[in-house]
UniProtKB/Swiss-Prot annotation:
It comes from Saccharomyces cerevisiae (strain ATCC 204508 / S288c). This is Uncharacterized protein YDR461C-A. Residues 1-80 are annotated as: Disordered. Residues 57-67 have a biased composition (Basic residues). It comes from the Eukaryota. Residues 1-14 have a biased composition (Basic and acidic residues).
Length: 80
């Protein structure tokens, strides 16, 4: 009975471990790569950048409100 339980609890594990990288990048190399990525992102077009930096909010009044309806006036402004 004990041998049956021990067979169930046995798992097949690989005997070999995954190899570590030979030479991981140093802190300075990592910081340099991050700086290059940021500089590459800054070279995108200003219109594309402005669309993310300044979101545009539009207010639509409720249809049953008595202010500006019919005509449904909308108010549009950008954040600073």
């Amino acid at each position: 009975m004990d041998s049956g339980k021990s067979d169930i609890n046995k798992h097949a594990y690989k005997e070999t471990a995954t190899p570590l990288p030979v030479d991981p990048p140093s802190y300075e190399e990592t910081m340099k790569q991050d700086k290059e990525e940021v500089e590459a992102d800054e070279t995108t077009s200003s219109a594309h950048r402005d669309s993310f930096m300044r979101p545009v909010y539009t207010h639509h009044p409720h249809p049953r409100s008595h202010k500006g309806y019919p005509g449904a006036k909308t108010l549009t402004y950008t954040s600073r």
